Amino acid sequence: MSSEAVAQATAATTSPEHGVPTSSATPTPPPSKGGGAGGGGGGEQQQVPFQMIPPGHFFANPFLNPYIPTAGAPAQEGEAQPQMVFSPAQYQEVMHHYFQQMMAASGAQFPIPFPMQFQPALQQPRPSSQASSSHRSEDDNGRQTAGSVVSSNVSPNHREVRPAEDSTETSGVVQNNDELLVPTSTSSDVTIGDVIEKSDSPENSQESAGGEEKSEEKRKLSGDRTDSLIRKQMSEMEKEITRRSQNKNIKTIDDDGLAELIGGSSTRTVADDFSPFVDKSGLSYTAPAPPSTEKSAPKESLNQLRSSFNLPDDSTTVGPVGPSTVPQQSQQFANNSMFMANAGNFVQNAFPIGVTMTPQATFGAAPGFQMMQPHQHNLFMQQPNPTFVNNGTNPFLQTQATLPNFVQNGTAPLVPTVSAQQFTPEQLAAAFAQQQIAQSAAPTPFDSPPPSMPSTSSGPSGALAPPPPPSHPIPRRVSGNGWPEENKENGTSTSTTNGAQSVPAAAGTDDPVWVLRDSYLKKMQREQRTSEEEEMSWQEAATAAQEAAENGGGDDQEEQETDRLLNGGTTGASTKGAERRGSVDKKKNSKETMVHEPAVLIEGVLFRARYLGSTQMLCESRGSKAARMAQAQEAVARVKAPEGDVQPSTEIDLFISTEKIMVLNTDLQRISDTDVRQDILMDHALRTISYIADIGDLVVLMARRMSTSHSDESCSDGDSSGGGVRKTPKVICHVFESDEASFIAQSIGQAFQVAYVEFLRANGIDDPSYLRQIDYQEVLNSQELLGDELEMFAKKETQKEVVVPKKAGEPLGIVVVESGWGSMLPTVVLAHMNPVGPAAHSNKLNIGDQIININGISLVGLPLSAAQTQIKNMKTATAVRMTVVSTPPVVEVRIRRPDTKYQLGFSVQNGVICSLLRGGIAERGGIRVGHRIIEINGTSVVAVAHDRIVNMLATAVGEIHMKTMPTSMFRLLTGQEQPQYI
């Protein structure tokens, strides 16, 4: 290759705003290749691709390009253009001084020498046919003139250009040539190198001539550059910076010219069609455009060009080489130079917004071009993650930990199979040919499918290129439905060739990688936590049950539980039982919810219990609740083992439904493959159950003994079939032990209610709302007030006149509070008396007395503040006359609640009644707002927690006895408040 064949023509300058060429060049076919070997004498100085040592943070000059002469403003035809042309070595020297001066002006030191030092990876001599490796200039003092280093730091699309050298001089001078200057070869294909768009204008010829003269003069100088040359070049660079910043070289172009630029012949260069990467910093990748059915590509607008990375419609697209081109590519690889292209992790948006780099010819744009070979990539990438430029200026680029090595619009698979060692050119060519043959089966280093577009196909004009592969490989799945958006999200896409949809390339090449989904892992973790919580809850329940068995209450506690059960139905369950149920609330609550569903009770529910024993007793036909409770206690005393003895018991399942109650053996018997049964130990019809009681953890079930003389299982309390002497009815009492004793009793009561409703429906009454309305009205009518408070206020006998003597100006020495909303007569109540005051000395008043009037002024219905004002006004009197009704300070309330389905109608907070439902059960029973609950069913709740009080009220049924008093009075009597006497 002669030195005249290595010249570079001017390329179109790109506007930073539009990213489109501002000067057009007539596309011409590539020149015919002639000549055989490369430049004379250059083969002995060749070396194989080198390895770069990462220099750290390096800031490339974004304003100048070492190989493209900078053109001035558009001028008339025939006039010479101001230009500045120099060789790569000269450019490096100028940039070295430029950066030193720039860093010195800012008060810093330039951290690294310029140009960057490179370490040769291999020192193997190469034949003269491969004549594009690094050279050394005679006058560069041993520095490499690797222009591709600067070029690769300027733009990801900038390819390395190594000019062929003569035996006596470095051909860095641009010759006056009207043709596209490319490395020549004996092959008919274009050799590996940068294709520079030619220019036929005389201005470029004059620029080339001027550049040659400058270069020849420069080579004659010594190694030390004069200050005048540096000042001149710095002045030119400052002018270039000013011109670029002001955008004076923008040239308007119409649609026809734009179509001519992007629709040229297939052999023209495509450097103009790639706008700088700076303009793409804020754009997101989208799915490829659908294939066009028409052959002619439509004209594109500036907006489409601004957001497009693709090659023109009829340009040659880089892609994998087919099998038919493998020998040709192997020969071409052996006969042409190898060079680096876009190696290393390169930050795409490395330059400030608004600064435009001069685009270079796209690598691989010529027919038959191949991307960087795998062994070259491996040698160049020995240093892990070499990053050329840090993204410190672009605010639109997201921070990435590691960025991939990529070439847009498809690259050949890069397989790192060749290690860094000495290779001959023949070995490298053979390895390249073998890699090309195994290309289709070789996995890519990114675990992403290789491009499926062949090198001869053409994609639709204006289609967007796919996004670069991720830095960390992630398993992707391809949408089975072929939705483009889903494929875009998954990082996979399907390419089109001549309008036909192609199958993703990674479908059958790689083995599938199975990864557990996050949802499945979370599900396993939830199940594990649930099992651990259940195990802990059962352990806590077992511990609580054991402690309760060891610390069980005596006869007094059993009597309290018995009274509570008698008065409140299934209030049943002691406070210890409620605490034990707290650890297994989930299971208990589920069963409690089940018993409220009629359909569940019709089918039946199961409770696990321990059967302690049974006994038989005589009973009256219509015995009272107290008598039945006494019988239940007697049955427990008969069956339960004495203290200290081992209690014999058997695990059983208690089945409860609306028809019967059965005691089942827990051992399952398999009758067949589909029939598994339990032995029935006892079976009682629901109508034979006469009484159910829960005493702590014990459940007593009383069932009437059926007469053997009656086939209809009627009760034996009637006459016998012979009409003889009446027999005393007998009941059999079964004693069970269970932690769910209260729920068992409640379920049996619910079963009776559901059975009754079903009986009414069977007889034509099928309106549940009607039944509920009648039922609730009956419950309201059953409420009654204890003590006949209304009669106490109505009768004169219960009222008394009290005269309290005192001194003038002396207060009475009393504290009054409200009687509470819900009381029969809203007035004030005497809550406290000063022990040394006139009221206490009179011995006529008691705490709890309700004051009707004072000195003839009625206090009924007055607010508390108004009543207190009236009492204070009596301070000047020497005697005070009052009408009072003597009532105890504690109000007794009795509520009848047949079942838990009827709400009580009041709310409680920390034992204080906060609100009351008008017309409800509680109001009918005498509950008052503002009162403190003192006792529930004989159990003091003064020092009981709020949750326990609520549980006691929520589960209480039957007759509920409560004692309350005004909260203020309670706090005064207990010393929680200081009295303010009036």
Swiss-Prot record:
Impact noted for substituting residue 156 to A: Abnormal endosomal localization upon hypoxia treatment
Boundaries of every PDZ domain copy: 801-886, 892-968
Effect on the protein of changing residue 155 to A: Loss of cdk-5-mediated regulation of synaptic localization
Effect the entry attributes to changing residue 358 to A: Loss of cdk-5-mediated regulation of synaptic localization
GO cellular component: cytoplasm; dendrite; dendritic spine; Golgi apparatus; Golgi cisterna membrane; Golgi trans cisterna; neuron projection; neuronal cell body
Highest taxon, organism lineage: Eukaryota
Membrane topology per record: Peripheral membrane protein
Post-translational changes noted in the entry: Phosphorylated on multiple Ser and Thr residues by cdk-5 which regulates its localization. May be hydroxylated by egl-9 isoform e on multiple Pro residues which may prevent phosphorylation by cdk-5.
Any single biological process term in GO: sensory perception of touch
Residue ranges, annotated region (Disordered): 1-55, 119-228, 269-327, 432-511, 525-593
Effect of residue 88 to A: Abnormal endosomal localization upon hypoxia treatment
Domain PID: 604-788
Basic and acidic residues biased stretches: 211-228, 577-593
Note on domains (UniProt): PDZ protein interaction domains may not be essential for function in vulval induction.
Designated name of the protein: Protein lin-10
Biological source species: Caenorhabditis elegans
